[in-house]
Swiss-Prot record:
Cofactor(s) it depends on: Zn(2+)
Underlying gene: Sirt3
PROSITE patterns in UniProt: SIRTUIN
Protein name per UniProt: NAD-dependent protein deacetylase sirtuin-3
This protein's GO CC annotations: cytoplasm; membrane; mitochondrial inner membrane; mitochondrial matrix; mitochondrion; protein-containing complex
Species of the source: Mus musculus (Mouse)
Example of a GO biological process term: aerobic respiration
């Protein structure tokens, strides 16, 4: 039976993506980023898709127009740590931070060891100290999270792929069905011995009390479903690879695009699909393999998002949404 045209495109894209991901083992190599923004449009002469320099370069205004007119309505978003730092989330890898100093009492060989299973089984306390700091509820979503929520509310968001484990996408009101949490979540937890699954709130009291949570059945350590080095990515990461074949716009915000296989997804959309990077630095394919419809907004991520929102004419809607949602979060804290 022949595939319809859209089905053929999806199949071809999945096959191409699978080939690229086969080169990057489906293992997590590590957990996943001002000045005023500078707008940079990558021209046709150096990009995929050919064409001469006379072709019109794509701009942030063009991206805004596609969204405003709903010419693009299947938006896939990729985000990293850079969207959460404005919420005040500390970097445990940065010397001088209180969290880094607190973790040093455990004689950690290097910060990333916290996410290594061997070290975790030897001494799980450093991870749970970090978990206590990052557990949902400690930090609030910022402008960028609520912009993504607004995309969902306007039925423009196909899927949001996040490297973050802070849960701020959920806290902004984006439903779980729209999320692929590539590096895991605190929403669920699993016993490392008997593999029983638990709701994340079941271990919350232990984590907040600086106790290592234990399975009530076998007494094994119960670990939040955060992806450690060498662990398989969540099944949803694979189930939604077709999203990139269906996408008509790709937004990439606040990520270094260094961690595979997440980083390879940035090249998984069709070559005709616009890609917008809002980031502190020029990264990944925007350096190595730019395309004609690439747009780069360099600088502070929040400032870049605010500029896009202004071009969209959504500023007041975003402010109203933030006020409503922050009021709800304040009510939950009482």
């Amino acid at each position: 039976m022949a595939l319809d045209p859209l089905g053929a495109v999806v199949l071809q894209s999945i096959m191409a993506l699978s080939g690229r991901l086969a080169l990057a083992a489906l293992r997590l190599w590590g957990p996943g980023g001002g000045r005023r923004p500078i707008s940079l449009c990558v021209g046709a002469s150096g990009g995929f898709g050919g064409g001469g320099s006379s072709e019109k370069k794509f701009s942030l205004q063009d991206v805004a127009e596609l969204l405003r007119t709903r010419a693009c309505s299947r938006v896939v978003v990729m985000v990293g740590a850079g969207i959460s730092t404005p919420s005040g989330i500390p970097d445990f890898r940065s010397p001088g931070s209180g969290l880094y100093s607190n973790l040093q009492q455990y004689d950690i060989p290097y910060p990333e060891a916290i996410f290594e299973l061997g070290f975790f089984f030897h001494n799980p306390k450093p991870f749970f100290m970090l978990a206590k700091e990052l557990y949902p509820g400690h930090y609030r979503p910022n402008v960028t999270h609520y912009f993504l929520r607004l995309l969902h509310d306007k039925e423009l968001l196909l899927r949001l792929y996040t490297q973050n484990i802070d849960g701020l996408e959920r806290a902004s009101g984006i439903p779980a069905s729209k999320l692929v949490e590539a590096h895991g979540t605190f929403v669920t937890a699993t016993c490392t011995v008997c593999r029983r699954s638990f709701p994340g709130e079941d271990i919350w009291a232990d984590v907040m009390a600086d106790r290592v949570p234990r399975c009530p059945v076998c007494t094994g350590v119960v670990k939040p479903d955060i992806v450690f080095f060498g662990e398989q990515l969540p099944a949803r990461f694979l189930l939604h690879m077709a999203d990139f074949a269906l996408a008509d716009l790709l937004l990439i915000l606040g990520t270094s695009l260094e961690v595979e296989p997440f980083a390879s997804l940035s090249e998984a959309v069709q070559k005709s699909v616009p890609r917008l990077l809002i980031n502190r630095d020029l990264v990944g394919p925007f350096v190595l393999s730019p395309r004609r419809k690439d747009v780069v907004q360099l600088g502070d991520v929040v400032h870049g998002v605010e500029r896009l929102v202004d071009l969209l004419g959504w500023t007041q809607e975003l402010l109203d949404l933030m006020q409503r949602e922050r009021g709800k979060l304040d009510g939950q804290d009482r």
